[in-house]
Amino acid sequence: MGMASMSSGTESLRLCVFDLRRGQHEGQELDKILFFYPPDLTFSTQLSVIGLSEGLITFTRLFSPEAACEVIEAERHSHVFYEAEPDIWMVMIVEKNKEIEAVWRIDALRRVLKEVHSLFVMFQGSIRALLEKEPTGGLVRSHLYPFITDYLNDLFVGKKQQLPSFRDTLKERGTVQMLTLARDAALEVQSLVGVLDSCAGTVRCHSVILFHDLLVSTTLSPDDTVDLFAFSVMRLTTNALSSGTSSWSYLRKGSGSPQISSRSTTVPPLGSGGTLPSGNGSSTGRVIRPLQHDKWSKGKDGFLVTDIWGLDATPTILIQKTQESFYLLTYQYKSLTLVLLVPIAAIVNGELDISFVKQQVIENASTKILKVEEKLSKGWGGENAYHVSGYRYLLVDNDMEVSRASPPGKVATLAKESLLALNKLREEVDTEKNRSKQEKDMEICIRAKNNTWVIARLNRGKELYMALEKASETLLDATDSVQRFSNRYCSGAFPMD
């Protein structure tokens, strides 16, 4: 629910990754293609799509060198551009459909591209680094094809492909959703974090703690927290491991069974053949596919196990802020998920081993984990914990990369006209933000066809979007309602001018 449904035909969605620095000479054009979906299109078709995209990028750079092409609206398609790395471009082409459900916001689609790239870098390193490591492009293709394909599987429900639609306008991909803690619970969490950070002796670890699909604590930077949070909600939390789909989690989970043909994960013969070194440092030639479904399970000791990295191998990730590699250990107790990051350098140097770290967690943190889970469960208000009667809202803190929103079940009660008006409102805000290229305070109010007020307020990096369906309200009544919400739930972060 809430995602624009698209058929699985090749016209519905095309997604490509290409390098502008490659394939500049005649006969070498295929070298620039690093990924293309669907992969069974002819090379001439793929080159045609990428050639058009490259031309648009080159042309728009003449007028805006610092910010090239972002979106092109054609009669039948929308072309969404994202420069993931210098001269490494991702382009999504979506078919325009007369069905009302196929109404989307361009920034929401671009956030899909940004998310899949960020997750890829977290597990495999940057695309440019892989190209420098193996210049033919075979290495990076061998990782991009299965990784993005596994990610796209989450956009399938049955045989229908789903993209973020106007029904998702009160959600914000690329942010984390946090659990509000009472003071006593916060103190218990702080104590637990201290124990986790010291589980590797003198080597400092990092930790991320989740309760259900909400963030409780993190010692990572906001960007790294967003990436690890997204992956945790997709594959690691209790909701992700269960067969059912969480109805209130922001990230929509796929059906659990691959819907994209297996040939989509096979690398087209563009690069060199033969066994390739792994992008994450493995010399076995194994292609790591961390986004595969049903590959994680809970062991007897409470730690999650997987064979994705190989039998008895420990998962690894790369942290953006420090460019440091870590082992990823995940411990689970009831609805509490603890992700512990241990520096690989410490293990390689023989200072400790993974089994020792796990034992330290079990011996030193078990009691604190039980206490934290108990306190969080007692204070937990359930799926509708952040529902505010009479309001349907989205609150975003761009500096902290945190968001909070009305529960999906409550948002679903809004009329279609209200959601469409909200989507249009957010598009106007996106346009203003892109035009100014800097933080801008503003307020926009729109009255929908069904007399619903939809309102946006932006102030000092924070954004508030709201729908008020009381048809009798005047503009003054609506703005007063927003102000009351701001004062009570946002610490007055959105004052009236």
Curated annotation (Swiss-Prot):
Q: Which UniProt keyword terms apply here?
A: Endosome, Guanine-nucleotide releasing factor
GO MF terms, alphabetically ordered = guanyl-nucleotide exchange factor activity
Q: One of this protein's GO BP terms?
A: vesicle-mediated transport
Disordered: where is this region? Answer: 244-284
Primary location recorded for the protein, binned into one broad class? other
Which cellular components does GO assign to this protein? Answer: Mon1-Ccz1 complex
Q: Where in the cell is it found?
A: Endosome; Prevacuolar compartment
Q: Which InterPro entries match?
A: Ccz1, CCZ1/INTU/HSP4_longin_1
Keyword Cell inner membrane, does the record have it? Answer: no
Keyword Cell wall biogenesis/degradation carried by entry: no
Q: Which Pfam families match?
A: Intu_longin_1
Q: What does this protein do?
A: Plays an important role in membrane trafficking through the secretory apparatus. In complex with MON1, acts as a guanine exchange factor (GEF) for RABG3F of the RAB7 protein family. Promotes the exchange of GDP to GTP, converting RABG3F from an inactive GDP-bound form into an active GTP-bound form. The RABG3F active form is involved in protein trafficking from prevacuolar compartments (PVCs) to vacuoles. May serve as a linker between Rab5 and Rab7 protein families in PVCs and mediate PVC maturation.
Q: How does it assemble?
A: Interacts with MON1.
The entry's family comment says:
Belongs to the CCZ1 family.
Q: What is this protein called?
A: Vacuolar fusion protein CCZ1 homolog B
Q: Which organism is it from?
A: Arabidopsis thaliana
